[in-house]
């Protein structure tokens, strides 16, 4: 397994270089001259030239690319154009609030979806199964903005069960006070598509020969579903969970914006509004690297869950 991990990490290098080159091209050739963006409409040529020198964009492209690569390797992306704050510090300080929301959400979403998927698979084709799928379809058709507005107005404003907005320096207060309503909203939004997907995974396994063999041997339906079917359905479930994990690192854009949560999602929106390229580039590289690492972790988890999986 160690040899496989080393080989995969080595293979990530050219992929990451391709991502870095693509980001560099997009922001330097397609994104326009940052000096004009920072200087504004009332600038003169001398101001534009001074800004170019400060940013280093007056140098040849290969020099700029090398500077960008060094920034990635040292995790030092310079300062934000809009606030002057260190970009690395922005990422580190905004990551905590996003993870406070999204780690509990991922755990709850996965566990609840698996339980309900097994339950509806046990009564597949019944009225209950059709009703659950219909509710999932309705839930998926409603915009997250509707959920945010309704839940915020009814549960926070009218009933005062949750704070409307806010965030503090206390992790406990954030988790058990300010995060509850945002997590509830995101759970309601995400549970419908996840449940439908996991149900399809379970039903694919229910139709396999080993299930019919287990039934013929007199194994109970609940044991077949909870042990045999779940074990084999866990591979695509792990794939789904791992593919969604990079989203943990960019936060929930709308939720963080509406609830005033200082996470990475809200920071991305602010950076885009202000054309803060250093912040956007850093987060883009950061997500690309995280995606490749999570894919590697998923492959290793496959081996742990099912020893029959061969890592090649």
Regions found by a protein language model. Give the residues of each.
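Alpha-helical transmembrane segments of integral membrane proteins
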Residues: 2-4, 91-128, 144, 171-312
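N-terminal signal-anchor/signal peptide hydrophobic helix marking the start
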Residues: 6-16
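Residue-level recognition of pore/gate-forming positions within transmembrane alpha-helices
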Residues: 12, 20, 42, 110, ...
């Amino acid at each position: 397994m160690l040899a496989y991990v080393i080989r995969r990490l080595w293979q990530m290098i050219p992929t990451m270089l391709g991502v870095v080159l693509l980001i560099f091209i997009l922001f330097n050739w397609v994104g326009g001259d940052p000096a004009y963006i920072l200087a504004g409409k009332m600038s003169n040529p001398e101001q534009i030239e001074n800004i170019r020198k400060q940013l280093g964009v007056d140098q040849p492209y290969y020099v700029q690319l090398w500077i960008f690569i060094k920034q990635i390797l040292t995790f030092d992306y310079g300062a934000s154009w809009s606030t002057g704050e260190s970009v690395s510090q922005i990422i580190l300080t905004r990551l905590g609030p996003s993870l406070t929301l999204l780690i509990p959400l991922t755990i709850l979403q996965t566990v609840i979806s698996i339980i309900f998927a097994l339950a509806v698979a046990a009564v597949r084709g019944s009225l209950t199964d059709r009703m659950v799928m219909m509710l999932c379809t309705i839930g998926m058709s409603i915009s997250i903005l509707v959920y945010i507005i309704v839940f915020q107005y009814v549960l926070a404003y009218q009933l005062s069960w949750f704070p409307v907005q806010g965030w503090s320096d206390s992790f406990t207060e954030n988790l058990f006070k300010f995060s509850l309503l945002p997590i509830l909203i995101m759970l309601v939004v995400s549970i419908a598509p996840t449940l439908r997907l996991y149900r399809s995974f379970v039903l694919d396994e229910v139709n396999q020969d080993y299930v019919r063999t287990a039934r013929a041997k007199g194994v109970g339906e609940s044991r077949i579903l909870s042990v045999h079917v779940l074990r084999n359905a866990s591979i695509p479930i792990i794939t789904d969970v791992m593919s969604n994990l990079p989203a943990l690192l960019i936060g929930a854009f709308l939720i963080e914006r509406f609830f005033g949560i200082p996470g990475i999602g809200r920071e991305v929106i602010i950076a885009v509004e202000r054309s803060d390229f250093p912040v956007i580039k850093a987060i883009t590289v950061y997500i690309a690297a995280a995606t490749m690492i999570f894919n590697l972790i998923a492959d290793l988890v496959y081996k742990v869950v099912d020893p029959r999986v061969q890592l090649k």
